[in-house]
């Protein structure tokens, strides 16, 4: 059973395949640089996926898990800084769509 109480599922749409690849690499660098900040703020886990079942879509999925609502709020502050750094560093235009939820139950099949 995970310690996560809240999750965010964020999709990021890109205009070109190159933008998506560069965006993935640069975002990972920024996230790694901020690893300790996110951990201290209460982030539990991050998973990044490339969406493959939407024809013509250049989309990444970001699943974030948080230990509680306070952790979510604190991590949002770090995200704002990270998004600004990403924009300034890459100039890539991306559309971001966020979905958030409270964990009702969690099943681990391993």
Q: What does each of the following model-derived ranges do?
A:
Residues 18-46, 81-90:
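Short amphipathic alpha-helical segments
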Residues 31, 43, 66, 75-78, ...:
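Extended interaction regions within the primary functional domain
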Residues 6-14, 47-80:
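Short, well-ordered beta-strand segments in beta-rich or mixed alpha/beta enzyme
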